[in-house]
Amino acid sequence: MLKAIVTGGGGKMGARIISLLEEEGGMQLTGVVEKKDHPAAGKDIGEFLGSGKRGIVIQSDLGFCIAGGDVIIDFTSHEASMRHMEMAAEHKRPIVIGSTGFSADEMDRIRKFAQNVPCVLAPNMSVGVNVMFKLLKIVAETLGDDYDVEILEVHHRLKKDAPSGTALKMAQVVAEALGRELDEVGIYERKGLIGERSKKEIGIQALRAGDIVGEHTVIFGAVGERLELIHRAHSRDNFARGAIRAAKWVVRQEPGLYDMQDVLGFRS
């Protein structure tokens, strides 16, 4: 039985992972971590989620429970994830990270830590979204420079980062397939008399409203036709199941930095 620790267990994603963890089979929850000022900190996770006492107290520091776990599933913030990644490397505990918003320097540190422990880092754990990544590469390579590319993402009003990590990953996949540097061609805002659209730019726009779980649309537009690839998430369960799948996979891997394309076998 694989023993799992969930960091960010009081959040929306963490709560769904905990609820689904043992339903998936082969895994047991042994630890939960949440930031010190979170309402869940210090409470029994079962009582906090309304499912009855489970005997697992939500800790405010991963160090209090890391020894009791075989794998860490982290959905926190990029700052907290950096601390958890460092501890995972120190204690040789495989880790799955679903947080987004990492800086270039933080990514360099993650790669360094991953030399000592296997880590799956993915902005989106959904199987459907990761299939879309693969499709985007094929479509972009096939259509080439004759089609304009625009990406639109829509999320709930509480989401803190924009554009979403998933939208940025989609843009990166398309840019690489077209031989472009996203830093040079990414356009994140249009306003005023900006003139004609340049041929190679990739537009990435974000909308925030209500309780929308997540929607991503990639438009390939040319004169006379338009191709759209759309992914809509109706609940967080698809992300949670993907994270659990990644956790079962990562414990069998050698140290290194992986993503969901590796988990799903798309690179083999």
Swiss-Prot record:
According to its UniProt record, where is this protein located? Cytoplasm
Identify the residues that bind (S)-2,3,4,5-tetrahydrodipicolinate. Answer: 156, 165-166
Q: What is this protein called?
A: 4-hydroxy-tetrahydrodipicolinate reductase
Question: So where does NADP(+) get bound?
Answer: 35
The UniProt family comment states:
Belongs to the DapB family.
Does the record bear Cytoplasm in its keywords?
A: yes
Q: Which CDD domains match?
A: DHDPR_N (cd02274)
Q: Under which pathway is this protein filed?
A: Amino-acid biosynthesis; L-lysine biosynthesis via DAP pathway; (S)-tetrahydrodipicolinate from L-aspartate: step 4/4
A GO cellular component annotated for this chain's UniProt record is:
cytosol
Tell me, what does this protein do in biology?
Catalyzes the conversion of 4-hydroxy-tetrahydrodipicolinate (HTPA) to tetrahydrodipicolinate.
Give the main EC class.
Answer: oxidoreductase
Pfam name, any one: DapB_C
**What keywords are assigned to this protein?**
Amino-acid biosynthesis, Cytoplasm, Diaminopimelate biosynthesis, Lysine biosynthesis, NAD, NADP, Oxidoreductase
Report the main location listed first in the record: cytoplasm
Q: Which NCBIfam families match?
A: dapB (TIGR00036)
The residues listed in the UniProt record as binding NAD(+), with positions renumbered to this chain, are 8-13, 34, 98-100, 122-125
Annotated catalysed reactions: (S)-2,3,4,5-tetrahydrodipicolinate + NAD(+) + H2O = (2S,4S)-4-hydroxy-2,3,4,5-tetrahydrodipicolinate + NADH + H(+); (S)-2,3,4,5-tetrahydrodipicolinate + NADP(+) + H2O = (2S,4S)-4-hydroxy-2,3,4,5-tetrahydrodipicolinate + NADPH + H(+)
Q: What is its EC number?
A: 1.17.1.8
User: Which residues act catalytically here?
Assistant: 155, 159
Please give one Gene Ontology molecular function term for this protein: NAD binding
Question: An example of a Gene Ontology BP annotation on this entry?
Answer: diaminopimelate biosynthetic process
Q: Which species expresses this protein natively?
A: Syntrophus aciditrophicus (strain SB)
